[in-house]
Amino acid sequence: MDYKFKLDLSWNIGLRNMYTPFSKINKLRLMIPNIISYKQNIIYTSPSFKREVDVFIRTTSNLDRNSVAFHRKELLDRLNTIIFENDLSGSTKGKWLSTKEFKKKLQATKILPSPFGWGELGVRDYEAFIHGAMLLKPSMAHMETWPPIFIENETYIPFNWDFSDLNDKISYFIKHE
């Protein structure tokens, strides 16, 4: 069966505000763009910034659509095991964090995993870039983006889609930070 008809050249989510994508003002600006002006002072964090948290992720996984929730749930389960068994600092669940607390946590994070969900690209990818954390993500070798943001072992660290090398990747990068 030929699936070429399903392919399309499109813009990706990274071309919109990824610094405060879920803020109230950003939501309003999307609804009434001609009334609320857009001025964003993005504060980037250097990757060399001292970081105390080995692994951190916050994501929803209790979703109605298993096709969206599966990869998130599987990643969270495996991360919890890896964090516990390797005595790493970090968390995959916890109380809701304010935007300020969340950004502070991202700035303190060494490895920011990013599961697939609604698609391959996610807000978390850009949060890692902005806050200088190492982006750990399923291999994106199958996808070409513009701008080319997914360059293996340069802009992100890939792991196998079946998670078979996840523990090894995390262990290696924690030991060789």
Locations of the language-model features?
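C-terminal "capping" alpha-helix adjacent to the active site of nucleotide-linked donor transferases
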Residues: I157-E177
